[in-house]
Amino acid sequence: MSKRDFLLEIGLEELPARFVSDGEKQLADKVESFLKEQRISFEQISSFSTPRRLAVLVIGLAEKQADVEEESRGPAKKIALDESGNWTKAAQGFARGQGVSVDDLYIQEVKGTEYIFAKKFVAGQETASLLPELKELITSLHFPKNMRWHTYSLRYARPIQWLVALYGQEVIPFEITGVAAGLETAGHRFLGENVTIDEPTLYKEKLLQQYVMADSEERKKAIRHQIQSIMEEKDWVIPIDEDLLDEVTNLVEYPTALFGRFDEAFLSLPNEVLITSMREHQRYFPVKNQAGELLPYFVTIRNGDHRHLENIVKGNEKVLRARLSDAAFFYGEDQKLNIDEANKRLDQIVYHEELGSIGDKIKRVKVLAASIAEKLGVTSQTLQAINRVAEICKFDLVTQMVGEFPELQGRMGEVYAEIAGEPPEVAKGIVEHYLPRFAGDQSPSSVQGTVVSLADKLDTIAACFGIGLIPTGSQDPYALRRQAAGVVQILLDHELDLDVDELLLETVEQLQEKELLTVPESEVVKQLREFFALRVKTKLQDEGVRYDLTDAVLASGISNVPVVFKKAKLLVSKVNTPEFKELVEGLSRVTNIAGKAEKNVAINPDLFEKEEERVLYEAYVQTKDLVQGALASGDVSAAYAALEQTIEPIHQYFEHVMVMVDEQVIKENRLALMHAFAGVIGSYANFQEIVFK
C-alpha cells in the first residue's frame, strides 16, 4: 500500500509554559486515536512543541483506509422468516439497509436466540479525504484556561496564528477561526523568518535554520548541557530543579544559557528567600560553591542566541537586584513584628466563611495536638514545645515575606522564631508542621512537628468534610487527598500507635462542640473513615501490594495504620508459599459459615458432642488471646503464626462435625463458635477476599 508522511502544526500566540507539554501530548494522543479509529495504518508518530506551536509528524501514513468486512445483526429468525420459510418484509428491509441481497443473509445463534446476519464489504476511503476531520480534533484540545478573540466563538488557550497540514506534498484543506491550513510556518519571533515546509520530514531541520528547536526533549537536553558547561568552566555547583527546567524548556524556542551576578550583601538573606526570588519570580537557577554555599551568581536561559549577551546579562541583573531589594526590605520589616502580636492578627483573617478565622483554627489544632501528645505519652517538656508550636505555627502568614512568597510559609516562621529567641525545637516544629507538603516529601523529624502536623491536617480535613467540602473526581480544591496521604505517611514513617478512628471522632466532636458542622456528625465520621481507608488502600497499592491482599487487610479496619501495612506485607511474603492456600481456605470456611450465626449467642462448651469441637474451642480461646495481644503490640508475625496453628483443628472439625444439624440448640452453639472464631480471624484480615488463580 502506498504511503506518505503527514505533518500537522498549530501555530499560536505564546502559550503559558504549563500548557505546552500537555498540549503536545493531547495532540499526539488524539491524532493517534483518530488514525486508529479510521483504520489508517502508519509507521511512527512524533510530536513537537514550543511556546508558539504544537505539532505532530506521522511517518508512513497509508493513502487509504483498510478495507473491512462488517457483520451486522438483524431481526430474530422468528421475525425474519414466515411459516413457509420465506423471508419476511423485515428481513428484506434489513437486507436493503445493508446493501446486500436476501440470498446473502445467514442465521447465527446468540445467547440461545437465532438471528439473521449480513456481511458487507466496505472499501477504505482515501486518507486525504478524511484528514480534514482533524479540524475537530484541533478544536477539542482542552487547557486549564481558555480565551476568545475577535468575534469567533471558539474558546482556546491562545489565538491560532497559522496552521500547517501537509500530507506528502498535498495541503489538507481546512480552516479554523479564519486561518487556513497551508505550508508556511513561523520561525523564531526575533531571529527567524517564515518558512515553507514542502516535505513533512524536513520540519525539524527547516525550523532549526530559523532558530527554533521544535523538539522539546532536545531543547531540555541542550539547556542541561549548557548549564553543565558553565558549571565546569566556573567550578560551580548549579542544582537543576527539574520542575524549573521543564518550565524554562517551554518558555523558549532557541535556548542559550548565561550567568549574571548580584550584590554579595544580599547573601545575608536566608537561602530560601534568595532561591525563591530567583526561581519563582525570574526563573533563574541559583549557584553554589563546592561546599554547598550560595554564591552571588545566577544562571538563566534566554530565548535567543549568543548575540548581545552582555546586554541581556545586565538586564537580568537589574531585574533581580530590584527583586532582592524588595525581599531585603520585607525581611527587615518583618523582624520588627512581635510573634504574639502577629498571632493576634490571625483572628482577623478568615480561614473559611463557615469555619471562622485562622485564629479559630489554631485554637482547635492546639487542643487536638495536646490530645495526640497525651496518647503518645510525651514528656512534659516536649508537651510544652508542642503547645507553643501549635499556638504560633501560622504566625508568619501575616508577614510581608510570606505575602510575597507564599511557598515560604513555615520556613520564614522558623527563621523569624529563631531571631525572636524561641527555643530551637519550637522553631523547627513551625516549619515541620507543614510536612509532608507533597507525595514523596519527607515527614516531620521532630515530635513537636509530627504532632502539630497531624493535628493541623486532621482539623483541615474534618472541617471541610463537616461543611460538605468533599473531594469529587479530579476536584480537590483544598488538597484534602494530599493532606490525608500526609497523615498516613507520618503514621507509617514514625510507626505511631494512634487509633485513626478515635482521632477522627475526636476531631469531629470538637467541630460539633464549636457548632461548625452543617453535616450530621455521624455522617461526617463515616465519610472520613471511608476517605482515609481509600488513602491507605492507594498507599498499599503504590507499594505493590496486590488488590485482593489490600482488600483483605482493609476489611479489618484502619485504626492502626502501621499494623495494617505490616499485615499486608506479611501476606505478600506468604502468598506464594504452599501452605498459604490451605490456611486461607480453612480460615475462609470458618468465616463463611459464621455468617449464618445468630448475634449474641454465647458458646456453651457443655453442649459439645465431639472431641473435635472441644479441641477447636480450646484453639479459639488460645488464639484469641495470642492474636489480640500480638496485634496490640504490632507483632503481626506472631498473630499470623497463631492463626497458622488453627488449621489442623479447623480441618479436623469440618471433617468430623456437621454444623447445620437439625437440633436447633446444638446448631446454634456450633454457629456461635464459628462466629466467635471468625471475629478473631477478621481482626487480622478477611481471608475470603484473597483470590487464587
Swiss-Prot record:
GO terms for cellular component: cytosol. Pfam families: DALR_1 (PF05746), tRNA_synt_2f (PF02092). Keywords: Aminoacyl-tRNA synthetase, ATP-binding, Cytoplasm, Ligase, Nucleotide-binding, Protein biosynthesis. It comes from the Bacteria. Gene3D superfamilies: Isoleucyl-tRNA Synthetase, Domain 1. GO terms for biological process: arginyl-tRNA aminoacylation; glycyl-tRNA aminoacylation. This is Glycine--tRNA ligase beta subunit. The keyword Membrane does not apply. It catalyses: tRNA(Gly) + glycine + ATP = glycyl-tRNA(Gly) + AMP + diphosphate. Belongs to the class-II aminoacyl-tRNA synthetase family. GO terms for molecular function: arginine-tRNA ligase activity; ATP binding; glycine-tRNA ligase activity. InterPro entries: DALR_anticod-bd, Gly-tRNA-synth_bsu, Gly-tRNA-synth_heterodimer. Its main location: cytoplasm.
